[in-house]
Amino acid sequence: MNVYLVGGAVRDSLLGLPVTEKDWVVVGATPKEMEANGFRPVGKDFPVFLHPKTQEEYALARTERKSGHGYGGFTFHAASTVSLEEDLIRRDLTINAMAQARGGEIIDPFNGRVDLKARLLRHVSPAFAEDPLRVLRVARFAARYHWLGFQVADDTLMLMKQLSDSGELGYLVAERVWKETSRALMERDPQVFFQVLHRCGALHALFPELAALDGVPQPEQHHPEVDTLLHQFLCLKQAARLGLSLNARYALLCHDLGKGKTPKEEWPRHIAHEIRSARLSKKVSKRLKVPKEAATLATLVAEFHTHSHRALELKPATVWKLFKSLDILRRPERLTDFLGACEADARGRTSFENREYPQASYLQGAADAARQVDIQALQAQGHEGPALGEAIEQARIDAIATFKQQELNP
């Protein structure tokens, strides 16, 4: 029995990055031998075990063969006779197909170290094209390591294009697409994930509403970058810069989808794009089975982001209607996410990257003022039933009005 550290731990160690997770491959062992040594079996499709002390995953070396469509369309074969190289060749990228022996020796049959040095994301073998999920994985790695200068190798991008054109991406289940997308959204350069998907044709297959924004112009006065898809990419870059939550980043992804439905004769203006964007965001969220709160925020940001941009112009009653839509009294964190997404939208424009966004602090302050209304005092004045509700609402609007006056006339 020989045990090797494999995959991401080896890759990140060679890059000088922190290793957060360790995966191991065991060559020359059987499931019975693993269990006899105290390992607990957890794999459903192939033999994977948890170490009795560290709880790290140990998988028996295995091969795989294409037997159907999609990510799950593979037959696996694990046996004590499977070699380390046979196990490594089934992996997606050369930089993920390295192993480290107990003594520290690096086993690198597919020149992963060469590609690490060249900053290339390159497929291990033509079998790469058998698994459509790898299109998303490569795009995610491109987003993760963009800051180090990594690029997708030309021949790998060609295989990704073939996969996108083949229709195989259509067999990916929604949960897998969302899992890869949500992970990519939280990377250091999330926009790169979608740029790579766009380059290989996968954006049109998986996110047609986003792909439809390519070439759609916006008013240059407000959007010096003009192109709406480029604006989306710039927004995601700002989202990472601002350290926004996953929910806020997903909301940004959906906030301008309605511009793809604007009649060409109306370009570059996009009247009522907010309503169209909200409708499309619901469609995307349903298709990808996006978690409820992320989906809700996406719809709200799509519908109300221009309210945030015009916050200082809005009447106090309109601001309170916005707050009610956001349900700020019960979900204060939603306002934080909403404003973060709106700020990234405002900054996600060529030459606007470092602009201040006073609307965020103004709306937070207005929300605080509305929350501080003394309901007991209103009850003491004799308000009750529906009249109490009306009095509370008017008091919140008045509190926002007072705050606005203080902000505009300090």
Curated annotation (Swiss-Prot):
Query: Any extra detail in the entry?
Result: A single active site specifically recognizes both ATP and CTP and is responsible for their addition.
> Per the record, what about its domains?
Comprises two domains: an N-terminal domain containing the nucleotidyltransferase activity and a C-terminal HD domain associated with both phosphodiesterase and phosphatase activities.
Homology family = Belongs to the tRNA nucleotidyltransferase/poly(A) polymerase family. Bacterial CCA-adding enzyme type 1 subfamily.
Please give the name of this protein. Multifunctional CCA protein
Q: Which PROSITE patterns match?
A: HD
Record's cofactor remark: Magnesium is required for nucleotidyltransferase activity. Nickel for phosphatase activity.
Question: Which reaction(s) are listed as its catalytic activity?
Answer: a tRNA precursor + 2 CTP + ATP = a tRNA with a 3' CCA end + 3 diphosphate; a tRNA with a 3' CCA end + 2 CTP + ATP = a tRNA with a 3' CCACCA end + 3 diphosphate
What PANTHER family is this protein classified in? MULTIFUNCTIONAL CCA PROTEIN
Tell me the function of this protein: Catalyzes the addition and repair of the essential 3'-terminal CCA sequence in tRNAs without using a nucleic acid template. Adds these three nucleotides in the order of C, C, and A to the tRNA nucleotide-73, using CTP and ATP as substrates and producing inorganic pyrophosphate. tRNA 3'-terminal CCA addition is required both for tRNA processing and repair. Also involved in tRNA surveillance by mediating tandem CCA addition to generate a CCACCA at the 3' terminus of unstable tRNAs. While stable tRNAs receive only 3'-terminal CCA, unstable tRNAs are marked with CCACCA and rapidly degraded.
Q: Which residues bind Mg(2+)?
A: E21, D23
Q: List the disulfide bonds.
A: none
**Gene3D superfamilies attached to this UniProt entry:** Beta Polymerase, domain 2, cca-adding enzyme, domain 2
Binding annotation for CTP: G8, R11, R91, R137, R140
The superkingdom of the source organism is Bacteria
Q: Which InterPro entries match?
A: CCA_bact, HD/PDEase_dom, HD_domain, NT_sf, PolA_pol_head_dom, PolyA_RNA-bd, tRNA_CCA-adding_enzyme
Q: Which residues form the HD domain?
A: 228-329
Residues where ATP binds: G8, R11, R91, R137, R140
One MF term in GO for this entry? magnesium ion binding
Q: Which UniProt keywords apply?
A: ATP-binding, Hydrolase, Magnesium, Metal-binding, Multifunctional enzyme, Nickel, Nucleotide-binding, Nucleotidyltransferase, RNA repair, RNA-binding, Transferase, tRNA processing
Q: Name one GO biological process term.
A: tRNA 3'-terminal CCA addition
Q: What is annotated about its quaternary structure and interactions?
A: Monomer. Can also form homodimers and oligomers.
Q: Which cofactor does it need?
A: Mg(2+); Ni(2+)
Q: What is its EC number?
A: 2.7.7.72, 3.1.3.-, 3.1.4.-
